[in-house]
Amino acid sequence: MEIFPAIDLKEGRCVRLYQGEFSKETVMNEDPVAQAIIFEKLGAEILHIVDLDGAIAGESLNLPVIEKICKAVRIPVQVGGGIRSLVTVEKLLSAGVEKVILGTAALYDKSFLEEAVRLYKEKIIVGIDAKNGFVATRGWLDLSEISYVSLAKQMESLGVQTIVFTDISKDGTLAGPNFEQLAILQKSVGIRLIASGGVASIQDVKKLNDMNIYGVIIGKALYEKTIDLEEVLQVTKLC
């Protein structure tokens, strides 16, 4: 199982939100580059970065910081948030990003998604963020009428190989992932699933591993130290 330590960027800083509420932010590190280096030194093999400003604006606003992170670490970096054009995809890949995560665009701009998948194949990941089972977009501000399962099936049919699934109600809560929705999703599609939101303990990670979930994004639990990164990396290697 892949472990993805998370760095959420807002106004150039590393922050955490509570249930996706931008008004409920906590600054975890004023220097995201330093935080990336810390994760790498602890053994992280890949980083998950979200441009929160970009998710709202619809364009990558933290590109300079992302580029600095890519230059500062030797491990791969995947980035999401505000990626709604091929130009932005190309800028991020040129900056050293390994994979990009499309969210809003996957729902509202299928032609862009299809072209991105055609050009960059496995480098394109789709992020599905759900609230009460329905897909939320534009930085989680808008709630659609499309179920997370329906969108996942559409993405699989378009050639997407990996999905990041987030239950927004769990994000930043340390209340545990939405195992039920993840299980439904896994039965519905045959592509890689990365779980995100609410992961609070090594037991959560072990349960996801037992479900054969491909990867898990861990954010607040690492900063609050309810999960030790070195320990969880060791545990997942032994599973």
Swiss-Prot record:
Gene Ontology biological process terms, A to Z: L-histidine biosynthetic process
Intracellular or extracellular location(s): Cytoplasm
Keywords from the named record: Amino-acid biosynthesis, Cytoplasm, Histidine biosynthesis, Isomerase
Gene3D superfamilies cross-referenced by the UniProt entry: Aldolase class I
GO molecular function: 1-(5-phosphoribosyl)-5-[(5-phosphoribosylamino)methylideneamino]imidazole-4-carboxamide isomerase activity
Superkingdom: Bacteria
Catalytic residues of the enzyme: D8, D129
Predominant place of localization: cytoplasm
Stored InterPro entries: Aldolase_TIM (IPR013785), His_biosynth (IPR006062), HisA_bact_arch (IPR006063), Isoase_HisA-like (IPR044524), Isoase_HisA-like_bact (IPR023016), RibuloseP-bd_barrel (IPR011060)
GO (cellular component) term, any one: cytoplasm
Signal sequence, start to end: none
Disulfide bonds: none
Catalytic activity: 1-(5-phospho-beta-D-ribosyl)-5-[(5-phospho-beta-D-ribosylamino)methylideneamino]imidazole-4-carboxamide = 5-[(5-phospho-1-deoxy-D-ribulos-1-ylimino)methylamino]-1-(5-phospho-beta-D-ribosyl)imidazole-4-carboxamide
Catalytic class of the enzyme: isomerase
Pathway: Amino-acid biosynthesis; L-histidine biosynthesis; L-histidine from 5-phospho-alpha-D-ribose 1-diphosphate: step 4/9
Entry EC no(s): 5.3.1.16
Family: Belongs to the HisA/HisF family.
Listed name of the protein: 1-(5-phosphoribosyl)-5-[(5-phosphoribosylamino)methylideneamino] imidazole-4-carboxamide isomerase
Organism: Bacillus cereus (strain ATCC 14579 / DSM 31 / CCUG 7414 / JCM 2152 / NBRC 15305 / NCIMB 9373 / NCTC 2599 / NRRL B-3711)
